[in-house]
């Protein structure tokens, strides 16, 4: 681990305002070069993780991640044959991630892009569920009214409850949770007569009967819905990744080099 010798170059990126437009960075046609560059960097890195090179640790981590993602996904959905039969070193892995909450279409687009890129490049796609973050709100603002006189209302999906990581956040009011789909559909009916929530929320209610964890319930039902739309990704919570042997090795190295890590981190933040 060595300090950065050249400053980072920053570019201002803005989400497009046109309907149906997308911001993709790096562009689709630059992905192959980025993959090749990443592999070269990993192979050339001389960092030693207590007797294990970075390339060896990365290979071990990919294998462990894939095995755990297959096991986790298989607990609530059918696992794609390609992923289930992938080699132990996992080959190419494409990862994305987000908190297990109800998010906007711009975030959801990322999941479809992840699946598309994995298929195109013969990789396995894994969506990392960031369950170490806390739940920011127990309700969402839903538009209603009419085109001429729109109005928004906050629709709760559960009681407020304590501020804890998603990993520990339980469903507190199952009746309130079960009714969220109908209440949301009623609120938005003047704008969208047949909203997607009517099809999606029964999946969330069904998963809620299998688990008392709110984040797990929302993420698994969303993933099930994506699979109906042709997305063949795997998923795994970050909390599960943190239990892997390779993660422990990586963490031990960071702790052993904590002073140097802090120096490099602060230099990069300052840039």
Model features per residue range: what roles?
Residues 1-100, 175-179:
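N-terminal regions that are enriched for targeting/export leaders
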Residues 3-34, 113, 118-158:
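N-terminal, positively charged nucleic-acid-binding surface of large information/translation enzymes
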Residues 49, 53, 57, 98-109, ...:
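Conserved aromatic-histidine-acidic binding/catalytic patches
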Residues 89-121, 125:
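N-terminal catalytic cores of NTP/NDP-binding nucleotidyl/phosphoryl-transfer enzymes
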Residues 97-100, 128-133, 238-241:
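An acidic- and aromatic-residue-enriched active-site/binding cleft used to recognize and process polar
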Residues 103, 133-137, 245:
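Short, well-ordered, mixed-charge alpha-helical segments that flank or form enzyme active sites
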Residues 127-224:
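Internal, well-ordered alpha/beta segment that forms a basic, Gly-enriched binding/recognition surface
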Residues 188-271:
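Aromatic-residue-lined binding/catalytic grooves and analogous aromatic/hydrophobic interfacial grooves
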